[in-house]
Amino acid sequence: MSQKLSVVIPTLNAQHVLPSTLETLMEGVFAGVIGDLVIVDGGSNDATLNIAKEVGAIVSETTPSRGGQIFAGVFACKCDWVLILHADSRLSQGWVELIPTAPDPERAYYFQLQFDAAGFAARWVATWANLRSKIFALPYGDQGILINKNLLASIGDYPTAPLMEDVILARKLGRRLIALPIMITTSSEKYIAQGWLRRGFRNLALLFQFLLGTTPEALYKKYYS
């Protein structure tokens, strides 16, 4: 990539997953692709902030809302291109070489999902996520997104909703979303804890309720309060 990019990571008690995510970004630092790293924390009570400060990130703190945290992070970025990652989603080795040299500023890019777990269930859920993204132009936040700030501004900036912020963004971008041939590995911890089928059904139920008109605020209150 000929231009530098900023990386934005929203965090909340991410001490166990953040270090490995940051490690995968090092090749971008060494290649001169990453201009700055912005970590926006939602009130962690573990070592997340210390980890962020140790690597020289621009650190800010706000109320816990992933959409709001990402919005604040994008605002603090110094580069025109922004790579938004979840704290538990890691880019595969060699990702720098597969990023387009001159990405289209009128397009947004996402990655191919896989889980850090073996087995049929993990492969099935990841396959569905990648098909959903391709067929319906609906990648989720754990697939990462590379977007130009001008494009983001043209669609009303990053959604600040407490839930479904990634779906709102994807629906605004539509067919301007392009899949990159780069794997991104996300944590399977919640799926394993709750059960792959139960967690998958819950996510699908959330999506359907949102598409049928339930507000993100109401969904957040229902599922997280």
Residue spans for each PLM region:
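Hydrophobic helical membrane-anchoring modules
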Residues: 1-2, 171-225
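Cell-envelope/extracellular polymer assembly enzymes that use nucleotide-activated donors
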Residues: 4-6, 36, 168
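Short, well-formed alpha-helical segments that are part of the catalytic scaffolds
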Residues: 13-29
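Acidic helix N-cap motif at the loop->helix transition within catalytic regions
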Residues: 16-19, 46-55
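Short beta-strand/loop segment that forms part of the nucleotide-sugar
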Residues: 22-26, 33-43
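A conserved acidic beta->alpha catalytic loop
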Residues: 41-49, 89-90
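Short aromatic/hydrophobic "clamp" motif used to bind/position activated sugar donors
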Residues: 82
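Conserved donor NDP-sugar-binding/catalytic core segment of glycosyltransferases
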Residues: 93-121
